[in-house]
């Protein structure tokens, strides 16, 4: 009996011990699992915070770098652009503005290379001629007047015709100038012109030709090319009110060409030529030239 009771007690104690061991194992296992889970969570949190920190650091550095680059790029552009743009503008603008302002002469400038001259007609009973005086170019022509004009002939030697000459009559109509022009009588082929306009420029080409010549005996020392007789007799062909008006000469022909206005008093054979007084200063040789030079 005693033996049986002892065996039963030992079995009960062994059972209790086994249960205690199992219980402690489960408790230990449960505790270990709790520690591992918390450790994993902590590591995940650390990883996420580290990644976010790295992202913030990269974002801050990326945002700061383009600002520095843009500042370094724009600073030299802002320095070079106004220097290159403003320097030529400041040099060219005053030069273009001061050129027309300096023209303070008696002539009336209507353009950069164009001037207008008003030639007053003071008297009525006179013959008015407009001549181009050769100064710098080669010999333009030689005109014979006086005795040979009685036969209705003039001499033209080595004529160099100047193109782009517009002659207008008193009604504003254009009068064409013929290159093979010859005067067959004293009263024909002369134009009653009110305005003579030169439209050539500095690079104008001159057509040179020899016209029909008769009696090549005499020529003036001052070679001229007579464009037009403004009036053979103003009192006969032009009303006195019109004859008293001014003659406008607009010119932009090359430098070296000048003009003069002469009138004749007397008959065909004995008449003398005089220069129209454009201003008070007249030269001793009776040539009061009006400069219509290209500038």
Curated annotation (Swiss-Prot):
A motif (QXSXEXXXL) lies at residues 9-17. GO terms for cellular component: cell surface; extracellular region. Residues 1-8 form a propeptide. The N-terminus is probably cleaved by the prepilin peptidase EppA, which recognizes the class III signal sequence. Its main location: secreted. InterPro entries: Class3_signal_pept_motif (IPR007166). The keyword Secreted applies. Residues 70-105 have a biased composition (Acidic residues). It holds the Pfam family Class_IIIsignal. Disruption phenotype: Disruption of the gene does not change the piliation compared with the parent cells. Residues 58-105 are annotated as: Disordered. Induction: Expressed under standard laboratory conditions at 35 degrees Celsius. It is found in: Secreted; Cell surface; Fimbrium. Keywords: Fimbrium, Secreted. Contains an amino terminal motif QXSXEXXXL, which is part of a class III signal sequence. This is Probable minor pilin MMP0601.
